[in-house]
Amino acid sequence: MKGLFSAAALSLAVGQASAHYIFQQLSINGNQFPVYQYIRKNTNYNSPVTDLTSDDLRCNVGAQGAGTDTVTVKAGDQFTFTLDTPVYHQGPISIYMSKAPGAASDYDGSGGWFKIKDWGPTFNADGTATWDMAGSYTYNIPTCIPDGDYLLRIQSLAIHNPWPAGIPQFYISCAQITVTGGGNGNPGPTALIPGAFKDTDPGYTVNIYTNFHNYTVPGPEVFSCNGGGSNPPPPVSSSTPATTTLVTSTRTTSSTSSASTPASTGGCTVAKWGQCGGNGYTGCTTCAAGSTCSKQNDYYSQCL
């Protein structure tokens, strides 16, 4: 019995590890720093945030400035966010910044956020779309923003389980930075988080498996020091489809005792590997035939 329990626990751990991820390491100009030295450490392991009204959408569950160092960077410096494992779920990657009124370590992110970068889908000539599902993401601090302390936020919006049967997942981390050598730009437009994302946004509700021909990343327009303007959605390729690298993982499952399945909501079902429960979760709770809603932690239950 003990052996069976251990095997079941290992199976769940493998399933969770292969499906979830966290941005945990920051690099500046190629210099990689220790895990969580400059990134606020969350308390929900690598689980996502799904509640659009939660303050956890800012920097993740339990992520605090206290105990996190703040790194000094120059405007224009290159930065990289590295994950514990490559992004596993389809969806856009976005980077935001919010200027702290004082020290970044004391800032709760309740002010305005402006977006500096989106990675959206590439639509190929064969009618498919590919996403940049990488193990790290690199961009540059805008050269024109004012000096001072900022929160630098990266977000993966996973839309692999189409709404409303499924619910999109936000994988988030915030780094604390002090910008020097900047300018007198006025970054914007800005949006509050929570509030920047709505369950009516086409980029939130889209079904990426059916008639998926265009996409707009949720959130405000991307800020540019060259007078603003967003990065437009990638156009449909008229020639050779884009080349992508497929990240594969092996999932192992076995029969196991699972958490009680919550009451069904409206007769909808969640596909295998999708989220079916957890603190703050308001989506569908009934798993598709052949899978069972299993509690991974207080924040996430998954159809296995």
Curated annotation (Swiss-Prot):
UniProt keyword terms in alphabetical order: Carbohydrate metabolism, Cellulose degradation, Copper, Disulfide bond, Glycoprotein, Metal-binding, Monooxygenase, Oxidoreductase, Polysaccharide degradation, Secreted, Signal
Cofactor binding note: Binds 1 copper ion per subunit.
Region (Disordered): 225-265
GO molecular function, one term: cellulose binding
All copies of domain CBM1, residue ranges: 268-304
Family, per entry: Belongs to the polysaccharide monooxygenase AA9 family.
Function: Lytic polysaccharide monooxygenase (LPMO) that depolymerizes crystalline and amorphous polysaccharides via the oxidation of scissile alpha- or beta-(1-4)-glycosidic bonds, yielding C1 and C4 oxidation products. Catalysis by LPMOs requires the reduction of the active-site copper from Cu(II) to Cu(I) by a reducing agent and H(2)O(2) or O(2) as a cosubstrate. Shows endoglucanase activity on tamarind xyloglucan, as well as on beechwood xylan when combined with phosphoric acid swollen cellulose (PASC).
Protein name, UniProt field: AA9 family lytic polysaccharide monooxygenase G
Gene, per the UniProt record: LPMO9G
